[in-house]
Curated annotation (Swiss-Prot):
<dbReference type="InterPro" id="IPR005614">
    <property type="entry name" value="NrfD-like"/>
</dbReference>
<dbReference type="Pfam" id="PF03916">
    <property type="entry name" value="NrfD"/>
</dbReference>
<feature type="transmembrane region" description="Helical">
    <location>
        <begin position="57"/>
        <end position="73"/>
    </location>
</feature>
<keyword id="KW-0997">Cell inner membrane</keyword>
<keyword id="KW-0812">Transmembrane</keyword>
<comment type="function">
    <text>Probably involved in the transfer of electrons from the quinone pool to the type-c cytochromes.</text>
</comment>
<feature type="transmembrane region" description="Helical">
    <location>
        <begin position="180"/>
        <end position="199"/>
    </location>
</feature>
<feature type="transmembrane region" description="Helical">
    <location>
        <begin position="222"/>
        <end position="242"/>
    </location>
</feature>
<feature type="transmembrane region" description="Helical">
    <location>
        <begin position="18"/>
        <end position="38"/>
    </location>
</feature>
<dbReference type="GO" id="GO:0005886">
    <property type="term" value="C:plasma membrane"/>
</dbReference>
<keyword id="KW-0472">Membrane</keyword>
<feature type="transmembrane region" description="Helical">
    <location>
        <begin position="288"/>
        <end position="310"/>
    </location>
</feature>
<dbReference type="InterPro" id="IPR052049">
    <property type="entry name" value="Electron_transfer_protein"/>
</dbReference>
<protein>
    <recommendedName>
        <fullName>Protein NrfD</fullName>
    </recommendedName>
</protein>
<feature type="transmembrane region" description="Helical">
    <location>
        <begin position="90"/>
        <end position="112"/>
    </location>
</feature>
<dbReference type="InterPro" id="IPR017566">
    <property type="entry name" value="NrfD"/>
</dbReference>
<feature type="transmembrane region" description="Helical">
    <location>
        <begin position="150"/>
        <end position="170"/>
    </location>
</feature>
Length: 318
């Protein structure tokens, strides 16, 4: 299979913008998951000055908005997307996803607003001094903020898994119709969130590479990566032990050709092995070059995983 035919073939329905959309949503869900867990395990490190929380403040909602814009404008009729925003169908994975996005964004904004209450009120007093409702809303959030935080964690996990459910619902593609996908995408999303957080910590001058939050992210990163490897193995073993359609899908994806090389060099090599090899360098120096190299490789690997699953998954039709 040539590079051109690898990205353009008859059974292809969803192409590269969907892969980027899945990647961005995973980063948001991963960052929020890590941020909530940091505040639960190390409350003193999860305040408004935390680099992880500040990164989540910008990238958390920003990645979702950018991902949705890519998805909307990629549709054949993007102006009809608003109908999905108000017409829900509990039998449609896409419709349920839109509902999840709406709830996720509302809770995320409220949760972050309370954490960055002092900054928000300072901005409100400077630019909108007559808008007193902001302070009233923040006061109402005080007694329910911990419960809101628990809901935020649940929604972040659901959103991270949803990207996998979206693909696994495509029953006509044996490769994609796999129950492992939601968990795999959740783990890889947390991995990408950790990479973004560590890059932000390395860039931010006030961030201590040996701080509580940096050590927390590093400790979370290791089991998540090993979990990702286990899930990839389980994913392929499940295909190998499946029916004829799943075996054909596995052979088409990993039996040689463009997507086989893409997986072994990009996903496994660059995304998993290279960051592990660079880990001692990162631990020794904790400088920007080391962190950028290791975390950049991890992020590219996660993006390449999304491309691999999406494109290789559509090579074989049941």
């Amino acid at each position: 299979m040539t590079q051109t035919s690898a990205f353009h073939f008859e059974s292809l329905v969803w192409d590269w913008p969907i892969a980027i959309y899945l990647f961005l949503i995973g980063i948001s869900a991963g960052l929020v998951t890590l941020a909530v867990l940091l505040r639960r395990f190390y409350p003193q490190a999860g305040g408004a000055d935390s680099t992880l929380l500040r990164t989540t403040l910008i990238v958390g909602p920003g990645a979702v908005i950018l991902g949705l814009l890519i998805l909307v404008f990629h549709l054949t009729r993007p102006w009809t997307f608003w109908k999905l925003m108000f017409h829900y169908s509990f039998t449609s994975v896409m419709s349920m996803g839109v509902m999840l996005f709406q709830l996720y964004m509302v809770v995320l904004v409220l949760w972050l607003a309370k954490i960055f209450e002092h900054d928000l009120l300072a901005l409100q007093q400077r630019w909108l001094p007559k808008l007193g409702i902001v302070q009233k809303v923040l006061s109402l959030l005080t007694p329910v903020h911990r419960g809101l935080e628990t809901l935020m964690l649940v929604l972040a996990v659901l959103l991270g898994a949803y990207t996998g459910f979206l693909l696994s619902a495509l029953k006509s593609y044996p490769f994609l119709n796999n129950p492992i996908l939601p968990v795999l995408f959740l783990f890889s999303g947390i991995s990408s969130g950790a990479a973004v957080a560590l890059i932000a910590m390395a860039i931010r001058q006030r961030s201590n590479p040996h701080s509580t939050e940096a050590q927390f992210v590093h400790r979370m990163e290791i089991p998540v990566v090993w979990g990702e490897i286990f899930l990839l193995v389980a994913f392929f073993v499940g295909l190998a032990l499946g029916d004829d359609g799943k075996v054909r899908a596995l052979v088409a994806a990993l039996g040689g050709g463009f997507w086989t090389w893409w997986f072994w060099l990009g996903v496994a090599g660059l995304g998993l092995i290279v960051p592990m090899l660079l880990k001692p360098w990162v631990n020794r120096s904790s400088g920007i070059p080391a962190v950028l190299a290791a975390c950049g490789a991890s992020l590219v690997g996660v993006l390449m995983l999304r491309f691999f699953i999406l494109y290789a998954g559509q090579l074989t039709v049941a």
